[in-house]
Design a protein with these regions (language model features):
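Short N-terminal segments immediately surrounding and downstream of signal-peptide cleavage
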Residues: 26-46
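Active-site HxH/HxHxD metal-binding segment of metal-dependent hydrolases
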Residues: 85-165, 182
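Positively charged n-region of N-terminal signal peptides that target proteins for export
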Residues: 1-6
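Conserved beta-strand hairpin/beta-sheet module of binuclear metal-dependent hydrolase folds
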Residues: 42-87, 187-189, 194-197
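Bacterial N-terminal signal peptides
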Residues: 9-20
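Metallo-beta-lactamase
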Residues: 68-69, 76-78, 163, 170, ...
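Divalent metal-coordination and catalytic microenvironments
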Residues: 49, 63, 73, 87, ...
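Accessory terminal helices/loops
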Residues: 21, 26-31, 229-234, 243-312
């Protein structure tokens, strides 16, 4: 239950609502939603018809084919018209396909609007299940703005090896072992040499690990070996949040998470409580590079502590 409460608070952070002090050892904080009328959706051209749209929520991948457009993730619904405008500058072809990397609102909030327009939505089986449950659950609706909307439910569930062929490009879907959640998809634009990770990788700040939905720090650390092997020196990586990255950024991120895990494991072995661990500020040196954004040190310490404590 403590993990569920803590994770729900982190989801609120990701959805930029509020965080309860009771959810973790960190102090309460409140983050306001932006002025949507002034929020930009910025286009990063990655070549070969692949673009990254960057804005308030999760990054969107765009593949512009000669007959159709494929999107990866859907942003906040309040930004839907701006997303459409950005896509229209890239291609005049219709948006036909939408792939959800996972179920969190800042990546699937726009699903309903796309679904109503006839876009076919794809996800893992787990992601579809979580979206359905979030729509039906009053608790989830209170924690994030899910509401009953059949058009927002993915209509096709996919697993490893599924490939899209759009505009001469091959797009491979990979359902990775549990990492950020247990339903994560990463997307490989093969000819373009681009990989989109969803929230399995944040570029420049601590990760979110959705433990109640199968997330695990060990799974994230292991995934970065896979991402590194998939990548070459010129591969562009679209993270869930943050700027475009490369494989050396992934390797550096893996090193940071290994260090976090090592320090928390040492505290667990020494018999420290979670509160004692948080009070000791063991990640202050890492905060200088990785802290101060979406995920704060006390939250990360708490979720890693619970995972390692449960494993003992």
């Amino acid at each position: 239950m403590k993990t569920l409460i803590r994770w729900a608070s982190a989801l609120l952070t990701m959805s930029v609502l509020f965080i309860s002090a009771a959810a973790s050892a960190r102090p309460a904080e409140k983050m306001d939603l932006p002025d949507w009328s002034r929020t930009l959706v910025e286009d990063r051209d990655l070549g070969h018809g692949v673009h990254m749209l960057e804005s308030f929520g999760g990054n969107i991948g765009v593949l512009a084919g000669d007959q159709a457009v494929l999107l990866i993730d859907a942003e906040w619904p309040q930004l839907h018209d701006k997303v459409l405008a950005a896509v229209s500058h890239i291609s005049k072809q219709p948006i036909r396909y939408l792939i959800n990397t996972h179920w969190h609102w800042d990546h699937v909030g726009g699903d309903g609007q796309f679904g109503k327009a006839g876009v076919v939505i794809f996800s893992s089986e787990q992601t579809r299940e979580y979206i359905e449950k979030a729509q039906a659950s009053k608790a989830s609706q209170a924690g994030a703005p899910y509401a009953p909307d059949p058009a927002a439910i993915p209509v096709v569930t996919v697993n490893n090896g599924v490939k899209f062929h759009v505009g001469g490009q091959t797009v491979e879907i990979i359902h990775v072992p549990p990492a950020h959640t247990n339903g994560d998809l990463i997307v490989h634009f093969i000819e373009a040499d681009v990989i989109q990770t969803g929230d399995t990788f944040f570029h420049g700040f601590y990760p979110d690990i959705d433990q109640p939905h199968g997330g695990t720090i060990d799974g994230m650390i292991a995934l970065y070996d896979t991402l590194y092997k998939m990548s070459g020196p010129n591969t562009k990586i679209i993270p869930g949040h943050g700027p475009v990255a490369n494989r050396e950024d992934v390797r550096e991120y893996q090193g940071m998470l290994r260090e976090v895990r090592k320090r928390v494991a040492r505290a667990v072995a020494a018999g420290m409580t979670e509160e004692q661990l948080v009070a000791s500020h063991p990640l202050d040196d890492l905060d200088k590079k990785w802290g101060g954004n979406l995920i704060k040190q006390p939250y990360l310490l708490g979720i890693v502590y619970e995972e390692l404590k449960a494993a003992n």
